[in-house]
Amino acid sequence: LESQELMVRASWLYHVEGLTQAQIGERMNLTRRRINELLAAALEQGVVRISFSSPLAENVELEARLCSRFGLHDTVVAPAPADPAHMHAVIGRASASFLDRLIQVRKPRSIGVGWGATLHETVRQMTGANEPAMRVRSLMGGLTRGSEINTFEIVRSFAKVLNAKCHYFAAPIYAGSEEAHAVITAQPVFQEFLRDGSNVEVSFLSVGDVTGHSLQVRYGLPPQTDIGELVALGAVGDLLGRYLDAEGNPVDHPLNRQVISPELDAYRGIPSRILASGGPHKHAILLATLRAGLATAIVTDSESARMLLGASDASR
């Protein structure tokens, strides 16, 4: 299925959008020779005739429209699973394929990652590489209890599958108070880590919502946090532990002054900012991050892609 997805995507960009093979290679993180092979195979196998014969072509069209609408460099749209319980696995598989190609072609020197089930599924399905000079960093603090979806386990797993250097961020997601946050982040070691996190070449994160589906809501928030207060202030979800409104702006809540992660302005300085999330409960926060220009690439499902485009059309 992955090979057919690559074949259809390359063929669409070449035959419909008129990109050169070199441009397609850069867009898809593949060599020009590989693009040539995919285009030839598409013709030989009948994928490309007068029109596309694969149902995956609709996803490629959605990708092109999302890139155009939101100014994205890359988009991957995976078929929406029939069972929502499989969403993390579907987005994870698509993200793994995307990251494998990006790392193989672009050879980034540093990658920053977050936490969660989508990232866990991604690293579990990656082919892997041998990049001993690469640095993998956690971009935010982690849960205080062990878990395979925790920031610490995620960054360790990415470093292992890439044979890269691992840089932990030994801090909680949230300080206990605004005063404690000021004390923690005033320490030179934390200032250096936040600065280094903002200087990675690629970031790979998922977004969180404000429903019971959210692992952040269930496990990551400080005790006694009232998620209803965040919702009342207009929060639709979080990125890097920072709760945002529908336009992608941080809401005025103490939690956003307690989170230990890069400021959004610093995060925007990362050249390649990949967000991977899908499912109806993520629609509002995905749209918010795109409106605010917080991503350069997204990996999502086809139903979410249609929602993002429809919501954008409605606001015009």
Task: For each feature predicted by the language model, list its residue ranges.
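Conserved phosphate- and dinucleotide-binding cores of soluble alpha/beta proteins
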Residues: 1-11, 15-29, 34-40, 46-52, ...
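Short, well-ordered alpha-helical scaffold segments within catalytic/effector domains
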Residues: 7, 85-96, 120, 190, ...
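Structural beta-sheet core signal
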Residues: 113, 136-138, 168, 275
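Glycine-rich beta-strand-to-loop/alpha-helix junction loops that act as flexible
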Residues: 111-118, 278
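Short Gly/Thr/Asp-enriched flexible loops that form oxyanion-binding sites at enzyme active sites
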Residues: 118-129, 215-225
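HTH-adjacent hinge/linker in prokaryotic transcriptional regulators
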Residues: 40-112, 123-133, 142-148
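Short alpha-helical
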Residues: 57, 117, 121, 281-284
